[in-house]
């Protein structure tokens, strides 16, 4: 199962940690894992390249299917509107995957909200 932990402070997402394999299909054929991976990495890359938001990637582990990413300035209430939109789009995508395929494959935890 994929577990997405979304960390909030004052309603701003300042960190996310996404870990695990969906187990929907065999390695290399799992469309849920592929969808989550591209969604998350595209969001991080877009924020890095298209906004002034500070991004800190704490850990990436391909074997564990883990990414731990932090946006330090957001914890202090500083954020860009562009990054906010991109993060909301990522969350919308994660929720859509969960609603489409079920909670047996992806769990989303909102922490601090």
Features from the language model and the residues they span:
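Conserved ATP-binding N-box helix of the HATPase_c
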Residues: 35, 40-47
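N-terminal intrinsically disordered, cationic/polar leader segments
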Residues: 1-31, 45-113
